[in-house]
Every structure is written in structure tokens, then in C-alpha cells.
């Protein structure tokens, strides 16, 4: 426990907040090119084949991004837009790919939460 005089002399050190999405550099989204599109398995106790892509961003960072929704049209050299947001059961996946933007198609049959998946309003 510091004395009053020690606090006056030095003060308290404020802990720096860790950035959860460093590759975005404070931007809401970033554009990048897929270098590899593959599936990976989640941590225990879950079981699935999660679709992910390794993306090289315009600022030079290379990150692993999750491809949300059922089915996708991404392949190597596809241009995508990524946003922040991790996938809890995939270690190292801290970004999401935006659907319905650039080379990523939206989901055609989607009826609910359409804006998240780039789906047009059904007639």
C-alpha cells in the first residue's frame, strides 16, 4: 500500500486496454484478398466443419476470418470486406467476412436477419 507522498510523486499507472481487432487499425471494416479458403474444427465440446478464409488485407496484415451463413462462393483471390467479431469456438479467428459485399454473395433464401447475410427482401 503506497503512502500519500508516494502517490503524489508517482501516481497510479493506468493499464493500457488491449485491442481485440488490431488488423482493422481503428476502421469499421477492411478490404482484403482471400489467400486460402478452408474448413476447420471447433474447440470441445462442439463439433462441426467451420468455414474460414485466410485474408491478406490492404494494410499488409494476414488474418483468419469466419465465413458466416450456409454455403458460400469464396475461393482464392476473392476480394472480401471483413469486420471485427470473434468466433468463440475457433481459436485465432477474430474477424468476420461481410456477406453480399464485393466478391462475397449474399444468401438467397434467407428470410430473417437478412441484413447480416446480404439477402434481398423477398417479394
UniProtKB/Swiss-Prot annotation:
Keyword NAD: no
HAMAP family (UniProt xref): Ribosomal_uS12_B
InterPro entries reported in the protein's UniProt record: NA-bd_OB-fold, Ribosomal_uS12, Ribosomal_uS12_bac
Name of the protein in its database record: Small ribosomal subunit protein uS12
Residue(s) carrying 3-methylthioaspartic acid: 89
A Pfam cross-reference name: Ribosom_S12_S23
Entry's transmembrane regions: none
GO molecular function: rRNA binding; structural constituent of ribosome; tRNA binding
Signal peptide (residue range): none
Keywords in alphabetical order: Methylation, Ribonucleoprotein, Ribosomal protein, RNA-binding, rRNA-binding, tRNA-binding
Family: Belongs to the universal ribosomal protein uS12 family.
GO biological processes: translation
GO CC list: small ribosomal subunit
Subunit field text: Part of the 30S ribosomal subunit. Contacts proteins S8 and S17. May interact with IF1 in the 30S initiation complex.
Primary role: With S4 and S5 plays an important role in translational accuracy. Interacts with and stabilizes bases of the 16S rRNA that are involved in tRNA selection in the A site and with the mRNA backbone. Located at the interface of the 30S and 50S subunits, it traverses the body of the 30S subunit contacting proteins on the other side and probably holding the rRNA structure together. The combined cluster of proteins S8, S12 and S17 appears to hold together the shoulder and platform of the 30S subunit.
Organism: Acidiphilium cryptum (strain JF-5)
Name of encoding gene: rpsL
